[in-house]
Amino acid sequence: MTPAPGGAPAIRLRPAHPGDLPACVGVWHAGLTEYGVRVGRPAMPLTSGPLLRLLGHLLATDPDGFWVAVADAPGAAGAVTTHDPAGAEGPIIAFVSALRREHVWFLSMLFVQPGHQERGLGRRLLAQVLTGSDDATHATCTDSAQPISNALYSRFGMVPRLPVLELVGRPERPVTGLPDGIRAVPFDLLRAGPTDGAGPRRLAAALELLDRGALGYAHPQDHAYLGAQGRQGYLYEGGDGSVVGYGYASEVGRLGPIAVEDSILMGPVMGHLLGSVRPAGAFSAWVPGSASAAVAALLAAGLRLEDFPALVCWDRPFADFERYVPITLAVL
């Protein structure tokens, strides 16, 4: 526990528990709302369901990388009350989540409650979850309009390298579909039958091959999460049955992740995904600037660029972002 001067509550770091996640959502929302006011963005609605599920996934797969900061006195100014039935501790005022996928360590989220920022708390949390990761490549995604965060991550070697563009909207014009000889096979078709059958085994092997080639590591746990959240996946095959890519879309409009063997397929795969579902609202995707064929396909369809770009930061190269579109900024 770190003592605080002037009667301010002391701050204690501890591993997160499932009951902490609603308070983490509150910290996340408060931090983004305050940031939005500073940069002229509209207030964000508090929709906790999808974020709670994402935080639950991060905690389940990487509990050692998920920590919270707790103020020792309940009712600290502006803090969000955590799930603490016994009333034994104060509110959660910050949290961090980092995941490890093979040789890559990735900072998913780091949020500090307004009123407790710029006091070194983010650095403390980051140092905590970096412990034991000296052998890893370190990476994160950050907002280009966050100079303090970008400076912090750079001090730990995670230097901004690549813009990630947010594209949003409904298709207004047709775009190029899959070329002759390439077919899309729904994941659901491959998953039919026994879980240890030929279809599921072939799908798992194909995803691993594509992920290692484009992203630099396999992450079957994240594919399982996408399936549980209802994202619709497609495996793309050549005329000889060879696997050339995969992609996801969803009825809520999220596009990605996408991985392809050849970057020339990124545009056609994105075009196919745009036509594969009719979302309740708009489509949205976070697309690396180097995935130029995907960016061009979305712009040609009528989607628009939103806000400031995000930045992928790393200390060592690990992925070919010309051939990969991430899940979110929190989980590549």
Give the residues covered by each predicted segment:
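Conserved active-site tyrosine of GNAT-family acetyltransferases
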Residues: 149-154, 158, 296-300
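Conserved GNAT acetyl-CoA-binding A-motif
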Residues: 104-109, 132-146, 278-289, 308
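Active-site rim helix/loop that mediates acceptor-substrate recognition in acyltransferases
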Residues: 2-4, 21, 26-88, 212-232
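A short, well-structured alpha-helix characteristic of acyl/acetyltransferase catalytic modules
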Residues: 2-8, 18-37, 175, 191-210, ...
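Conserved beta-strand in the GNAT
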Residues: 66-68, 78-99, 106-111, 240-256
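Amide-forming acyltransferase catalytic core, primarily the GNAT-like/NAT-type
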Residues: 155-253
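Conserved acetyl-CoA-binding loop-helix of GNAT-fold acetyltransferases
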Residues: 109-112, 117-131, 150-155, 263-276
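Conserved catalytic-core motifs of GNAT/GCN5-like acyltransferases
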Residues: 139-142, 159-173, 305-316
